[in-house]
A protein has these predicted regions:
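N-terminal amphipathic/hydrophobic interface segments
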Residues: 3-253, 268-271, 276-287, 346, ...
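Accessible peptide chain termini
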Residues: 1-3, 532
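Outer-membrane beta-barrel proteins and related beta-barrel translocases across Gram-negative bacteria
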Residues: 29, 35, 104, 180, ...
Length: 867
């Protein structure tokens, strides 16, 4: 085969590299594997503080390992307790289930030169060459020989052997007897401190063989019957022949490769040949067979895989699963590394109960104009959806100014063919972040902020989906949200007035809702809202007092088309309202040093803060003012101190109320807030009269429910968040809570609940429970589960449970999921069973669908370590 010949034939014989593959290690390879095990640092063995020299003969080499069994999976040792462990790699924190870590041997001299070489991209041949041996001969013309404990160092490369012979005319050298060839690669300036860090090293290989030929004036080398280990990839194997043809390229023939422990590896790849390029970060295997426990599982004529964390073109790990609607499905994504600043992924999906589907994603990054991504999918004539075509499109672009870092912009476009799309297809992560939304926003907006101004300019429209909740009919145009074409919002603070805080809000928008179905007459208008507030804060250690006065103005004007269509008079064409507002906010601080219970906590301080706020604003009739996008806020503790229950600028509330509350906090000696509890209530001195719509009743209950909230961290691994409200008659208004317990870095438990009664804020009854658990079982197996239970419907709205197995070299996930489409009122859930397999070194453990689902649903999941 062209381009795969060695640079020079080794000094002694050996069969051709093109003979029939033989993947069982021969005697020479067996000996090389045993010696290679000397550089596998067991987890429970500390790194040596003094250097031990390399064995000088095969007898010593064999003594470095014990209990060798020739019938093990690859003839590797069963007991790794080497006496020869030389390492320049710092102590490495190993992934769980790994018995050890591949480490570089140390150099007995010129270590500073080797470290400097690893941090530069200079050719290795440009560094000086150093050598030492027990005996040397040099004829000053054509021949040089070193023998007896030979060590040769040049830049990033080390060679140790019993004998080295050099042809001075062509620069070809031959190393014989217990040969060790080490290339530490380029690691940059960042030291290796963890098992994940070593993947940042480009290149890096340990080679053990009985004889090696190499060129002294280049990076070329050839070894036969060789065992090798990649420190950056934490992989090892053996080969009939290994050729290093440049600084970054390796050609390996008749090879076994695995990232598992060297003792009975769970999986391995046997290949006719493998090409590795550390410049591109990829490997190419031809005639490859994946074996699990020596059983052939998959044959691949060609396989492209990563050797580090850089992105390059190639197949990603396929996904396989089963669902009640789609049946068996298989997704085989292919990644295109088109350029450093843009790439693409194309994913064909095959379903047993549907037609094939094609999904594509394109990502790009520009120098001055931001970054974005486009994701689209198409499935023709879906057999599970009345033979209708199914499709989706998502586009997002983000930009941030380099000259003005606080200036940014974003563009978003979303489209799906039907409301069931999210329920049926969960392969498009960009769209999945939106959830089951009835109205999908499409917008262009720009943002700017500084110390005194926050500004937003936005154009926004929506795609409104049909839903069973609307009778499975198209939503009437009159019930769709208004477009904002455009909206400009300013929040500002005037800086030049001492002692006074002058702040303001200005919001300008044109609202349009096209009516094409005749469901109502179109009512489009411009709206302008302004509010300016002058406050005089008095802050002292004992507390604070803040009087404030505001002037609010709301102006709306219908456009000419709306005026003509609705026959509005001149008086009804526009509406202008001015409303003043007065408030007084005050609070006290009572400090006490020490903890509330010396038995459980020490040090720190306690703080009790009573607070009282009064707000007054007169009533102005707003019956004829349209409501474009304003709604009522939910009842909770922070909302008690807002001056308005309205979220939006279509209403200016009338206020005459008083809000008392008290807060207690304990901060311990190390700065953790162990307890933060508050209780408060709003007292209406006068019934409010401004409402959102004519059919809504005003809030006139005399006083609000008593609202409470509590956050606590009683232990380092336990968190509690509670809040709720009780009506004046003692009945429940609402309560919800969240408990999180994380006893270890690999286990997590969550329990959440919410209960709410229908109230004057337009909120409906709600009762639900959420729970999740992640914990290791044993021997690498872990359980993952999360449920959402709807008490009102007496059903699990979303349930997921599965097991994962993660070892040093592969991961397996099997899980099932049952869930309802929230836009579908039927009682038929979608059920799916999925399986995912990842092989370390050629895939990412946390890139699977299961990790994405758990990350979206489980608080604290992303902080867990791999099991």
């Amino acid at each position: 085969q062209t381009g795969r010949t060695p640079i020079s034939a080794p000094p002694t014989g050996g069969e051709s590299a093109r003979t029939r593959p033989n993947y069982v290690p021969n005697t020479q390879q067996q000996a090389s594997l045993e010696r290679l095990a000397s550089f596998y640092q067991p987890n429970d063995q500390q790194l040596p503080t003094t250097e031990v020299t390399r064995p000088s003969d095969s007898a010593d080499a064999s003594s470095t390992v014990t209990n060798t069994t020739s019938d093990s999976a690859d003839g590797v040792t069963q007991n790794l307790t080497p006496t020869v462990i030389n390492t320049t790699t710092p102590a490495i924190t190993n992934a769980p289930m790994c018995r050890g870590t591949w480490v570089y041997p140390s150099s007995s001299f010129h270590a500073a030169d080797a470290q400097a070489a690893a941090k530069t991209d200079r050719p290795n041949s440009s560094f000086p060459l150093y050598a030492e041996a027990d005996y040397g001969y040099y004829d000053n013309d054509t021949y040089a020989e070193l023998s007896g404990n030979v060590q040769v160092n040049q830049g990033r490369q080390q060679i140790a052997a019993d004998k080295v012979v050099v042809n001075l005319q062509d620069g070809v050298a031959a190393a014989q007897g217990n040969v060790l060839l080490v290339d530490t690669g380029q690691s940059g300036a960042t030291p290796v401190t963890s098992r994940s860090d070593i993947r940042n090293v480009e290149g890096g290989i340990i080679t053990v063989a009985d004889e090696v030929a190499y060129q002294t004036d280049s990076s070329k080398a050839t070894a036969r019957d060789v065992a090798f280990a990649s420190v950056p990839l934490q992989a090892h194997g053996y080969a009939k022949q290994l050729n290093k043809i440049s600084e970054s390229q390796y050609q390996i023939d008749e090879v076994m490769f695995t990232t598992c422990d060297p003792v009975n590896p769970t999986w391995k790849i046997n290949a006719k040949n493998i090409d590795i390029d550390t410049d591109t970060g990829r490997g190419e295997a031809r005639g490859a067979t994946l074996k699990v426990k020596n059983t052939p599982i998959l044959y691949l004529p060609y396989f492209n895989f990563p050797i580090d964390d850089r992105r390059t073109s190639g197949f990603l790990i396929p996904r396989f699963g089963f669902s009640t609607d789609g049946g068996v499905n298989l997704q085989t994504p292919y990644y295109f590394n088109l350029a450093p600043n843009y790439d693409a992924t194309l994913t064909p999906s095959v379903f047993s109960n549907r037609n094939p589907m094609l999904t594509g994603e394109f990502r790009y990054l520009t120098r001055d104009y931001g970054a974005g991504n486009i994701t689209g999918s198409y499935l023709p004539s879906d057999r599970q959806y009345n033979d209708e075509d199914r499709s989706s499109l998502f586009y997002q672009h983000r930009w941030q100014s380099k000259d003005i870092p606080t200036l940014s912009a974003e563009a978003v476009y979303q489209y799906v063919s039907d409301s069931a799309y999210f329920n049926d297809f969960d392969t498009m992560d960009s769209l999945n972040t939106l959830g089951n939304q009835l109205n999908l926003p499409r917008r262009i907006q720009a943002n700017y902020y500084n110390d005194y101004l926050t500004a937003l300019a936005k154009f926004e429209t929506f795609q409104t989906l049909s839903s069973d909740l609307t009778g499975n009919q198209e939503v009437l145009d009159k019930d769709k949200p208004y477009y904002r074409l455009p909206q400009l919002s300013l929040h500002y603070k005037l800086p030049w007035i001492e002692k006074f805080d002058i702040t303001g809000v200005s919001d300008f928008a044109y609202f349009k809702r096209p009516i094409d179905d005749g469901s109502a007459l179109e009512q489009s208008a411009g709206r302008m809202f302004n509010k300016i507030t002058a406050a005089y804060p008095i802050n002292r250690a004992w507390g604070y007092v803040t009087p404030a006065v505001s002037l609010q103005h709301l102006y709306t004007q219908y456009d000419q088309e709306t005026v003509l269509d609705n026959n509005y008079s001149k008086d009804n064409k526009s509406k202008s309202i001015f409303v003043p507002e007065y408030s007084l906010d005050m609070g006290l601080n009572f400090f006490k040093a020490g903890s509330p219970s010396d038995k459980h906590f020490t040090g720190g301080y306690q703080l009790i803060s009573p607070r009282l706020k009064y707000v007054y604003a007169p009533y102005e009739d707003q019956t004829d003012v349209p409501n474009f996008n304003t709604r009522l806020a939910s009842l909770n503790f922070p909302q008690l101190y807002e001056n308005s229950w309205f979220l939006g600028y279509d209403r200016i509330p009338d206020n005459n109320h008083l809000t008392p509350s008290v807060n207690y906090r304990y901060i311990d000696g190390v700065g953790l807030t162990r307890l933060d509890a508050s209780i408060g209530q709003r007292i209406y001195l006068e019934d409010s009269r401004v409402v959102l719509d004519a059919n809504q009743q005003p809030i006139n209950s005399g006083r609000s429910a008593t609202v409470m909230q509590l956050s606590s961290q009683p232990r380092q691994d336990f968190w509690v968040d509670l809040d709720g409200a009780v009506n004046s008659d003692g009945s429940l208004n609402y309560y919800n809570g969240q408990f999180r317990y994380q006893p270890t870095n690999t286990s997590l438990y969550n329990l959440g609940f919410v209960k709410r009664r229908a109230n004057e804020f337009g909120q409906k009854d709600l009762s639900a429970i959420t729970a999740s658990a992640i914990f290791p079982i044993r021997n690498g197996w872990s359980f993952l589960g999360t449920v959402q239970y709807d008490n009102d419907r007496s059903r699990f709205s979303d349930a997921l449970a599965g097991v994962t197995y993660e070892s040093c070299c592969y991961g397996l996930s099997i899980y099932g999921r049952s869930y309802y489409n929230e836009l579908d009122s039927t009682d038929k859930p979608t059920r799916a069973i999925m399986a995912e397999i990842s092989l370390n070194g050629i895939s990412n453990r946390r890139s699977g669908r299961l990790s994405g689902l758990m990350s979206d649903r489980v608080l604290g999941y992303n902080q867990l370590q791999s099991f």
